[in-house]
Design a protein with these regions (language model features):
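Terminal, low-structured helical/coil segments at or just beyond the last alpha-helical repeat
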Residues: 41-50, 137-168
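Canonical tetratricopeptide repeat
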Residues: 86-87, 122, 156-160
Length: 168
């Protein structure tokens, strides 16, 4: 049989554990409420990409560049930097490529959004195709500023510039 003292110690242990669990629960609730409140009241819900963007990206991923060009031209979202960038990319990658058209759309994307990372990278690669190393390096410098802590687009264009230089 347990003594009264042992029973009292077990009861105290039980109460201590119960208190610790309640404390953890309350701290968790408090943290969750703070996280919930940290979102601004005016934050709009995340927008879903327009159908033309989803379709064009799928065509590009499947390397169906002519199809992507048709989808993008049908959407005719000329005021969108993404639209101009993807159309430029598709024109550059299709066979045969339309490099003049691609440049026009990259320039339009950058006029709308001067720090559009995709357009800066792809336009830089187009500059290399056209043997314009200074132009590619200027776009690389702009991309460096747009990517404060580094980004894939900067790394990709930097690698393309280095490969270009090693071939010359």
């Amino acid at each position: 049989m347990s003594s009264t003292k042992e029973l009292q110690e077990e009861a105290n242990d039980f109460l201590t554990i119960g208190f610790q669990m309640k404390k953890r629960f309350l701290v968790t609730l408090l943290l969750l409420s703070v996280i919930g409140l940290s979102q601004a009241a005016d934050t709009a819900p995340a927008k879903q990409d327009p159908i033309w963007l989803t379709q064009a990206r799928a065509s590009i991923k499947a390397e169906k560049y002519d199809q992507a060009v048709q989808q993008l031209q049908a959407a005719n979202e000329t005021s969108s930097a993404d639209w101009n960038n993807l159309l430029g990319y598709s024109l550059r990658k299709k066979q045969p490529p339309d490099l003049v058209g691609a440049e026009k759309y990259y320039q339009a994307a950058l006029k709308i959004e001067p720090s559009h990372r995709g357009a800066l990278e792809y336009y830089g690669k187009l500059k290399l195709i056209n043997n314009d190393l200074p132009g590619a390096e200027a776009l690389l410098a702009r991309l460096d500023k747009a990517c404060t802590f580094g980004c894939e687009e900067y790394s990709d264009l930097k690698e393309a510039v280095q490969k270009y230089k090693s071939k010359k």
